[in-house]
Swiss-Prot record:
InterPro entries for the chain: Chemotax_Me-accpt_rcpt, HAMP_dom, MCPsignal_dom, sCache_2
Function: Chemotactic-signal transducers respond to changes in the concentration of attractants and repellents in the environment, transduce a signal from the outside to the inside of the cell, and facilitate sensory adaptation through the variation of the level of methylation.
Name of the gene this protein is made from: mcp4
Organism (species): Thermotoga maritima (strain ATCC 43589 / DSM 3109 / JCM 10099 / NBRC 100826 / MSB8)
UniProt-listed PANTHER family: METHYL-ACCEPTING CHEMOTAXIS PROTEIN CTPL, METHYL-ACCEPTING CHEMOTAXIS PROTEIN MCPB
Family: Belongs to the methyl-accepting chemotaxis (MCP) protein family.
Domain of life: Bacteria
Membrane topology annotation: Multi-pass membrane protein
GO biological-process terms attached to the record: chemotaxis; signal transduction
Entry protein name: Methyl-accepting chemotaxis protein 4
Chain segments annotated as transmembrane: 8-28, 190-210
Domain HAMP stretches: 209-261
Amino acid sequence: MRSIASKVLVIGVVVVLAFFVTQYVLLNTTVFNSIMERKKEEAKHLVESVYGILERAYEMEQKGELTREQAQELAKSLIGKIRYDDNNYFWINDTHPRMVFHPIKPEMNGQDLSNYKDPNGVYLFNEMVKVAKEKGEGFVSYSWPKAGSDKPEPKISYVKLFEPWGWIVGTGIYVDDVKVTVGNLIFRNVLTVSVIGIAVIIMIFFYGRVLSRKTKAVLSALEKISSGDLSVSVDIKSKDEFGLIAQKLNETVGNLRKMVQEIDKSQDEVERVSEELFALSQQLRSALEEIARASDTISKEVQNASASIEEVTSGSEEVSANSQNISKLIQEISENADNIADFARNGQRVLEEAVKKVEDVSENSRETADVVSNVTESARNIEEIVRTIQSIAEQTNLLALNAAIEAARAGEAGRGFAVVADEIRKLAEESQKATEEISQILENIREGVERTNEMSKKNVEITKDARRLVEESYESFNQIVTRIEDLAARIEGIAASAQELSAASEEMSSALDAVAKTTTTVADEVEEVSENITEQEKAAKRIADIGTELKKLSDELKEDVERFKI
């Protein structure tokens, strides 16, 4: 692929050559015609000035100052001495036609010119008589030798009829004299255009090199960014579109770098919190297992207490001994209830810590989402600038089209430049292709950012679920603590009843009934606690799953972050 410097140089050369061809064509057509018209106008004015000599001589004849012959000789003498533009002259012939007077070829004086023709077969003097009689004056084209030469040259003469004497006075312009004038003008213009063109090409060459360096710097930075290197920085200080691209690209890289740092930081935090959640879930499950074991113990002891109560009711003689057993069992039940309450409170503290950790993860996820949004916006800014470069490529294509039009105007001489102009259009299309490649790189960056954004959103949703589950677990633990406290109060009632049973045998029946009812209530409470423990075990398992999922997400983030070099 050709560099931008070579493309710009080729465009500059083609434009200069097109301008050169245009100047050449204009000088050989428009300027030639313009100079020819000016020369013809000068010839007309010169003939009219000489015509005044004839009028003056005729006036002298009319006044009687001179005879006609004298007046005509005076006019011929005066006109024969006039020269202009390096030996150009005037001649006089009549309407016969005969040569009246020719200052360069006097041997023609008095000759019949009706059969005189030039090498191209033009009866030039007959044409002069025809123009003079029909219009009084006009131009005639033919070939005639220059003074001091026998070679006929293309010539355009202006003739005018002097009716009083029947004379036709005329003078001519040699076409090759006009061509020499145009050639000198072409040489001067070619020299000027060449100097200017060389200067322009040199300027375009150096500008193209500067443009190429800027483009290579931007492309190199984009290639490094696409490979994950975020330590790059484009150093372009100009105030044109490339300077703006460099500024926006550096801002985008800075935002990407900040985003990756934030993601890396968040990943570490997510990994730490996921590990802590997993550890907390293990502690919670251990606590729930302890509570379950204690509940089983309480259930068994309550059953034992119920059996003892039945035995007490079946035999009053064993009341004293059984009441002591009941007191002992109730004491053990009270101690186990206290242990359960301690486990439940410890679970509450663990869940409070889990809520804080989940809130930290949620906040980090939101910050990461904000940074990703900023990076997306910067990528959109660079896409706008890339569209500006595409517009420049389109303008280059239009310039190539204009060069092709100018070459077409030059006709056969510019046919070769039409091919070059077509090549310029191809080069402009390659420039547009380069901008499309830049756009593709930006699209890859944006896809990566969007993927990170999706992962951040997923992280936020997961932390929301974790927080909801932890809060539900916390509420369930509150219920467990409340029920355990109620259970402890009921156990204290059982203890009081047992003491009353030991102290007063006469109240044994009523006390045993109260103990039986209370024991039944305790059994129900223990069953409810067991059900709550089962639910909490499910919640603890879900918390562990969330911790595992967060750990997996953290590993994925870590893999993405490790792709970048900060």
